[in-house]
């Protein structure tokens, strides 16, 4: 029997205040308010397609720019994911997903290995998507990988930047959903720990 895989994490700095409440075995419910509409949209998509119950409340120095808020939300979400997974007994651990969205195609492969690493092939034409700098889309993925201690390979192609980013976050959601799925009772590593 699996215990509830849930975590609540808070991150407070001079730049941001972030609170994340994550339940891995959820139904896709979300309540997200980061002050950045596009980031909210992406996180709601992660919750919906990852079947995660997710609450995010963030206040950041948006008068400076979006960087600190995007980064700290990703760091806090990653910490919550890592904590909620515990010792990772029984999880599938590795997964991938490919998501089309009109002209865009995104692929994400990840490993909840305990070893953070990212390989990204993301190109956006516009400097800003909604209210988020396009360079911070990749930075979100990198920050999430570091704090969740997971390996993420992600690529996206297409013409419309909104479609590319949204396909990326949906692929991330589906890969997480598959990787956290419980398949057996053992820790999925020849080392005996992750």
From Swiss-Prot:
Keywords: Amino-acid biosynthesis, Cytoplasm, Histidine biosynthesis, Lyase
Main location: cytoplasm
Major enzyme class: lyase
Compartment list: Cytoplasm
Entries under InterPro entries matching the protein: IGPD_sf (IPR038494), ImidazoleglycerolP_deHydtase (IPR000807), ImidazoleglycerP_deHydtase_CS (IPR020565), Ribosomal_Su5_D2-typ_SF (IPR020568)
Alphabetized GO MF terms: imidazoleglycerol-phosphate dehydratase activity
This protein's GO CC annotations: cytoplasm
Domain of life: Archaea
Pathway: Amino-acid biosynthesis; L-histidine biosynthesis; L-histidine from 5-phospho-alpha-D-ribose 1-diphosphate: step 6/9
GO biological process: L-histidine biosynthetic process
Record EC number: 4.2.1.19
Signal sequence annotation: none
The reaction(s) this protein catalyses: D-erythro-1-(imidazol-4-yl)glycerol 3-phosphate = 3-(imidazol-4-yl)-2-oxopropyl phosphate + H2O
Listed Pfam families: IGPD
Family statement: Belongs to the imidazoleglycerol-phosphate dehydratase family.
Protein name: Imidazoleglycerol-phosphate dehydratase
Organism: Methanothermobacter thermautotrophicus (strain ATCC 29096 / DSM 1053 / JCM 10044 / NBRC 100330 / Delta H)
């Amino acid at each position: 029997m699996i215990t509830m895989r849930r975590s609540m994490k808070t991150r407070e700095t001079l730049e941001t205040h972030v609170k994340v409440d994550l339940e891995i075995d959820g139904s896709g419910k979300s309540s997200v308010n980061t002050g950045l509409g596009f980031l909210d949209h992406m996180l709601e998509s992660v919750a919906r397609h990852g079947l995660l119950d997710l609450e995010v409340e963030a206040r950041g120095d948006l008068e400076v720019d979006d960087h600190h808020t995007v980064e700290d939300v990703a760091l806090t979400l990653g910490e919550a994911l890592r904590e909620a997974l515990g010792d990772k007994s029984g999880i599938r651990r590795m997964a991938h997903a490919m998501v089309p969205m009109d002209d865009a195609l995104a692929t994400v492969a990840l490993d909840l290995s305990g070893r953070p690493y990212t390989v990204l092939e993301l190109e956006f034409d516009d400097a800003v998507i909604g209210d988020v700098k396009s360079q911070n889309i990749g930075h979100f993925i990198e920050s999430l990988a570091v704090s969740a201690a997971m390996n993420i390979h992600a690529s996206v192609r297409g013409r419309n930047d909104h479609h590319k980013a949204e396909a990326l976050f949906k692929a991330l959601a589906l890969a997480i959903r598959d990787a956290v799925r419980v398949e057996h009772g053992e820790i999925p590593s020849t080392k005996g720990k992750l």
